[in-house]
Amino acid sequence: MKVDYEQLCKLYDDTCRTKNVQFSYGTAGFRTLAKNLDTVMFSTGILAVLRSLKLQGQYVGVMITASHNPYQDNGVKIVEPDGSMLLATWEPYAMQLANAASFATNFEEFRVELAKLIEHEKIDLNTTVVPHIVVGRDSRESSPYLLRCLTSSMASVFHAQVLDLGCVTTPQLHYITDLSNRRKLEGDTAPVATEQDYYSFFIGAFNELFATYQLEKRLSVPKLFIDTANGIGGPQLKKLLASEDWDVPAEQVEVINDRSDVPELLNFECGADYVKTNQRLPKGLSPSSFDSLYCSFDGDADRVVFYYVDSGSKFHLLDGDKISTLFAKFLSKQLELAHLEHSLKIGVVQTAYANGSSTAYIKNTLHCPVSCTKTGVKHLHHEAATQYDIGIYFEANGHGTIIFSEKFHRTIKSELSKSKLNGDTLALRTLKCFSELINQTVGDAISDMLAVLATLAILKMSPMDWDEEYTDLPNKLVKCIVPDRSIFQTTDQERKLLNPVGLQDKIDLVVAKYPMGRSFVRASGTEDAVRVYAECKDSSKLGQFCDEVVEHVKASA
């Protein structure tokens, strides 16, 4: 490969208009006002190519999205060949390259930093390997321009093959990146993966699960309402619903807040984050009947929350904790029926923000192991993948998935090959189908929704039945502005404070006063503030409980 640095210099000068801005790459990648992202897109495009070269030309994904953020924002993140998030050791490179492009006074200064990265990772630019990139974007108005900034150097300078998926959900980008590489590794002669592969696979798994139970009705409720946050989830979901293999009567499903063509409506008074935060129905939805089920996606359809309205018109949220416990209940039972409860390990992974009632229910009622990790999907995903054969994780905000180990797949295949037509076989087939219904690469609103619908139908549970498995403890999350958030240092997966010294002891004394009380403090990742979480048995005392903790935090800050 011959790198055309003269062309790269021209593209740098033409593209990198945003200068002297510090950029940070977090769990969500880069994310800020869209008007400030041209420079970041340019550098991220180069980094994605280098990542593919490092991995001998495997497909690397790049998604342009800002998820549940306001429509003025946008962002970008890189996806590994297996559909997982960018390797943690490469996150500093993303920042290094972006900030080099931002603060360099000329192209040569940027080129020096680029050369350092290439040398450090021992990437051979004289190779015959062709880098492969999969790109996708959400429905934001700024996305087409930012895509041009992203891909400007990929083919013209680095001779990369770029597969542009157009407008897709974030989980579709993850899935298609993974599938493209699996086909490449297996020597599959089929063309590169497409979104049609996505729809065919997940609808197929959904239908097979119902066929296994000989269930004709696909929904356990008379009607399902889906709020797609006026984001890319709307048109992509409608493609699924229009598929000839989708076997749910049209009158049973209604998609609302599906105006992805009106940029300023994105996430406005709708979507998963709005519903969870405000504990209310989204804009455009009024209670139709108390036996309907509702769900909301976020802007790029990688998270989902459910809810219903009871006969007294009271709103009930079924969040990520409720989703993980539903799946744990269902899959634990299937393992027992298949007599595999001692062979395969199932567990639920949570963060400190999980409601204490959900943790108690999983441990004491389901008798299922629970792990707690630091906040952030990469921590949850790693724990689920490394500690369990069936690792279930959902953040309370509705982002999550289930990871099935290689041992799980080997065991199920082996047991199915020798089992007879009995209860064992039904459970084994259920486990196999369910593992295919889940998008294991990342949280996926569409896939997770299908899995919830299938579980409720098989268990013959109504939304109220699901909700009544356990009752959430009253809880509150408040933001407390502090002069310097860096002094708040935690341990025990962010549940205890090390510093400021003595503050944790004061919090413990407050917690002890409230039955079933729990509280923790952690620094914000983006601003000089800390988040104070509190929960207790008595909702009338919750405000007082939280205020006491906040007072101690302010005094220590």
UniProtKB/Swiss-Prot annotation:
SUPFAM superfamilies: Phosphoglucomutase, C-terminal domain, Phosphoglucomutase, first 3 domains
Effect of gene knockout: Results in undivided strings of cells and growth arrest after approximately 5 division cycles.
Record-given protein name: Phosphoacetylglucosamine mutase
Protein's pathway: Nucleotide-sugar biosynthesis; UDP-N-acetyl-alpha-D-glucosamine biosynthesis; N-acetyl-alpha-D-glucosamine 1-phosphate from alpha-D-glucosamine 6-phosphate (route I): step 2/2
Gene coding for it: PCM1
EC number in record: 5.4.2.3
Places the protein is found: Cytoplasm; Nucleus
Family indicated by similarity: Belongs to the phosphohexose mutase family.
Keyword Magnesium attached: yes
InterPro entries for the chain: A-D-PHexomutase_a/b/a-I, A-D-PHexomutase_a/b/a-I/II/III, A-D-PHexomutase_C, A-D-PHexomutase_C_sf, A-D-PHexomutase_CS, AMG1_II, AMG1_III, PAGM
Enzyme class at the top of the EC tree: isomerase
Residues annotated to bind Mg(2+): 67, 298, 300, 302
